[in-house]
Each structure stands twice: as C-alpha cells, then as structure tokens.
Amino acid sequence: MDALDKVLKPKTKRAKRFLEKREPKLTENIKNAMLIKGGNANATVTQVLRDMYALKKPYGVLYKKKNITRPFEDQTSLEFFSKKSDCSLFMFGSHNKKRPNNLVIGRMYDYHVLDMIELGIEKFVSLKDIKTSKCPEGTKPMLIFAGDDFDVTEDFRRLKNLLIDFFRGPTVSNVRLAGLEYVLHFTALNGKVYFRSYKLLLKKSGCRTPRIELEEMGPSLDLVMRRTHLASDDLYKLSMKVPKALKPKKRKNISQDTFGTTFGRIHMQKQDLSKLQTRKMKGLKKRPAENGVDDQGKKSKRIKKN
C-alpha cells in the first residue's frame, strides 16, 4: 500500500484541520494546478511554466526541480504529486528531438488521470518580453474562444473544456466592472491554437458605459496539437456527476429557461366573461341623438312584425 493511501489519524489540531480540508465535500475546494518540469526541459519550456504559474497564482504549485517522467507512458508520478499537493490540474513541460518544446495539459479525477492533451509550442512571447503593466495576483480572467474547430472536432471540444477548467479560477456569484481586468483569448485555426492574453483598459466615453481597449499583456503562444489521452464517455459522465444534495429541487408547475428566467404555470377554470363588470366611462355613454335613432329602429321592427 502506498504511504499516501494509508488512513492517517491526526495527532495535532493543525493536522486535523489539514485532513478535514482534503475530505470530500458537497462544494469542492478551488481546483489547484501543479506545473512540473520534465527531465530535459529547456529554457523556453521552463519560462512557459513560470508564466502560467504567474497567471494561476495563488491556485498553483510550481515544481522547480526536474522530474524524469513520461505522462503518456507512465502516470504514477503525476498521480503521486497530485495526492501530495492536492492538485486536480497539471501542466507538464518537456523537450526532446522528437517532440521539441512540448506541453502536456490535463486533469485528475479521484487522483487518477482523467484526460490530457499534448501541445507543441511553435512560437512563444513571455510576460517579461512585453513591457506593459500586469494584473494583480489572483485576478479572475475572462475566457474567449474563437474558431469553429472548438465546436466541431471532438479533440478540440475536449481541449476547450480542459482550458476552461484550467484557467477559470474560483466560482463567484457576481463580479464588479472594475474587477474585469484581463482576457485570455483562444483561437482555433487550421489545426492550431493561438493563445493571447490582453489587459482590459476602461476609458472615459462621456456616458455611463466606459470605452474598452485591449492592451497585449503576455504570454503569447502558438500551439499545435499532438497526442491526446481522452477519458471514455462513461468515465467523463461520471466525473461530471452532481451530488443529489446540490441538485435544485423540482417545484411543481415552475420551470427555468437557459437564461435562468423563472416561469410559472397557473391552472384556472374557464371564466364567464358575460358577467364581467367593466369600468363605466363617460366617453362610452350613448348620446341623446343615438338613443332617438335606436328607439326609431325598435318601433320600425315592431311595425313590421305586426
């Protein structure tokens, strides 16, 4: 049995709080990401991992030492580090002659690899190469995806879902306008993914809504997809299962549309409109001339009948 799989009994209150923090919960903790260097990572891959760690702070763990492992051949090392650091997301960087400037991005389910996708770095511009102001640590980004490949191809559809999981940050109920500080833009075109990062500038516009400008902040990457390791449909569905306690209770005759608008259905008996009392207005009263015409019409009808 692995040392991390043993049932541990806390000896101090601090250890008890630490173990309680890792226990299964209805509302899970914020997903942390671990960034790992391979045994032969070069300067480009190392800088990419540093920049990604800067975007993920404080929800990331950067391993500075090199780790000789191959995620697609042996996943035990990744699973060990996942348990040790309590991280469900990972990014692994390596470099060799066959696959230069290589990145593997993936996620865990129950401390086992759920899916991972290998990406090759064709072009890279670092955070420090772009001399502009940066966003503060822990800022929640806005994610934009452009390109039909993200909705057509299964590999790119999974990659989109994985990138959202990796960069979305904590779940919040609302965000103030000044809190929207930077954008991560992903474009899928001709089998490649273009990753860009922009800082959001709110300018005066003369009205209540400010004028928005984008300023490139970095990092910037041109990526090409290589190998994939995707979970089966059953396992993927199991990983997305929502506990019964968190599911909204069904209320009779009440439904919601895709935008969250609540609709209610009311069952009523058929109403007799003949007995409906309407508001009497002066403008609707008959005039004396009209009454005279009506009286003459009634008299003529009586004469004809006689």
Curated annotation (Swiss-Prot):
Q: Which GO terms describe its biological process?
A: maturation of LSU-rRNA; protein localization to nucleolus; regulation of signal transduction by p53 class mediator; ribosomal large subunit assembly; ribosomal large subunit biogenesis
Q: Which PROSITE patterns match?
A: BRIX
Q: How does it assemble?
A: Component of a hexameric 5S RNP precursor complex, composed of 5S RNA, RRS1, RPF2/BXDC1, RPL5, RPL11 and HEATR3; this complex acts as a precursor for ribosome assembly.
Name of a matching Pfam family:
Brix
What's a GO cellular component annotated to this UniProt protein?
Answer: nucleoplasm
| Spans annotated as Disordered | 270-306
Which top-level group of life is the source organism from? Eukaryota
Q: What is its main location?
A: nucleus
Q: Residue spans with biased composition (Basic residues)? A: 277-286
Which of UniProt's keywords are assigned here? Nucleus, Ribosome biogenesis
Family under the similarity heading: Belongs to the RPF2 family.
Protein known as:
Ribosome production factor 2 homolog
Instruction: Tell me where in or outside the cell this protein is found.
Output: Nucleus, Nucleolus
One GO molecular-function annotation for this sequence?
DNA-binding transcription factor activity, RNA polymerase II-specific
Protein role? Involved in ribosomal large subunit assembly. May regulate the localization of the 5S RNP/5S ribonucleoprotein particle to the nucleolus.
Report the residue ranges that make up the Brix domain in this protein: 31-234
